[in-house]
């Protein structure tokens, strides 16, 4: 018996975009980022950042469902994220005024600020009672993808500079000081710290995703695209 698979036009386009994305990522992943074209690097970083944001949103949603509705959690005031001091554009006027290299610098500062916290989020996801296996896996994937994004961002940034930066020592990123609360033996302090971490990583990865799309529009498409997030 012959089976015929019929795809709607919309489904066929989604499949085409998915396959194209995978092929592009395989093409880039098979090369050192230093020899990947700027256009391809932007396309792949946007794909990576968008997927990472989806995972961050899923992790935050799961935490919210499992933990955040506890009565004591509702009475607490959420503190500022540790990246709040990093200057990033907040409206279209600031976006247009910011130079590409300064834009990349800001995004790198946000991304590198999450290297250490994401390591600890992975540990907490594995050891927290009530956290699913899926939540732990997504935390690991977020940590790994952030490093991939960071490597690509550094490559793009270096292409705007006369002097190549080999590491992040010259970037002005804020230190994270939330480990004490995260390691607290008090369950309320511990869970509240995880809640804040999940909330902030979702917020910041959304920023990275949005800003990469803005820069891709500027650099790759010469501003001939619609980015209306601001």
Swiss-Prot record:
It is found in: Secreted. Residues 1-29 form the signal peptide. Disulfide bonds join 81-200, 217-225. One of its GO terms (cellular component) is extracellular region. The keyword Cytoplasm does not apply. Glycans are attached at residues 109, 158. It holds the Pfam family Hormone_1. Keywords: Disulfide bond, Glycoprotein, Hormone, Secreted, Signal. It comes from the Eukaryota. Its main location: secreted. GO terms for molecular function: hormone activity. Belongs to the somatotropin/prolactin family. This is Prolactin-3D1. It comes from Rattus norvegicus (Rat). The gene is Prl3d1.
